[in-house]
Amino acid sequence: MAAPVTVRVQRDDFDIAAEVSALCRARTDIGAVVTFSGLCRDEAGALSALELEHYPGMAEAEIERICHEAVERFGLQAATAIHRFGRMEPGANIVLVATASPHRQAAFDGANFIMDFLKTSAPFWKKEHHADGSAGDWVSAKDADDAARDRWTRR
């Protein structure tokens, strides 16, 4: 049986507990579930919102490709990846990655792999909106994100 993969790109918030429940529903072969939730953060106290845009259709396809690669590479029994778009205030959910496997290490590795590639390969763009009402810049990609992704190619 192929491992189920759930991918959604949506404007609405998600319920982490409900997503984990759906991931594990009627499964007795799962011994470990790992979740990662990414939140909108305000590091300097000047952010009122973060605006996320994506390339519809292409973002979903790329995330699905990444999830299927993780399932194959780590022997996952299920994977879920949800990414939001639109305007979000600090503290709001942005992304959820959940992986299930018989053992914890595969679940951890799968979640890390999905997040590292999602962050660098899926077509999303972020724009900051400042508390003073001004629009900030589009957020640039970080070298650290590329390095995190590249570690998987050296294994």
UniProtKB/Swiss-Prot annotation:
EC class name: transferase
Catalysed reaction equations from the record: 2 [molybdopterin-synthase sulfur-carrier protein]-C-terminal-Gly-aminoethanethioate + cyclic pyranopterin phosphate + H2O = molybdopterin + 2 [molybdopterin-synthase sulfur-carrier protein]-C-terminal Gly-Gly + 2 H(+)
UniProt xrefs under SUPFAM superfamilies: Molybdopterin synthase subunit MoaE
Biological process per Gene Ontology, one example term: Mo-molybdopterin cofactor biosynthetic process
Gene3D superfamilies documented for this protein: Molybdopterin biosynthesis MoaE subunit (3.90.1170.40)
MF-aspect GO terms: molybdopterin synthase activity
Binding site residues for substrate: 39-41, 103-104, 119, 126-128
The protein's annotated pathway: Cofactor biosynthesis; molybdopterin biosynthesis
Record keywords, A-Z: Molybdenum cofactor biosynthesis, Transferase
Keyword Transferase attached: yes
EC number: 2.8.1.12
InterPro entries: MoaE_sf (IPR036563), Mopterin_biosynth_MoaE (IPR003448)
Function in brief: Converts molybdopterin precursor Z into molybdopterin. This requires the incorporation of two sulfur atoms into precursor Z to generate a dithiolene group. The sulfur is provided by MoaD.
Subunit description: Heterotetramer of 2 MoaD subunits and 2 MoaE subunits. Also stable as homodimer. The enzyme changes between these two forms during catalysis.
Family from the record: Belongs to the MoaE family.
Record protein name field: Molybdopterin synthase catalytic subunit
Provenance organism: Rhizobium meliloti (strain 1021) (Ensifer meliloti)
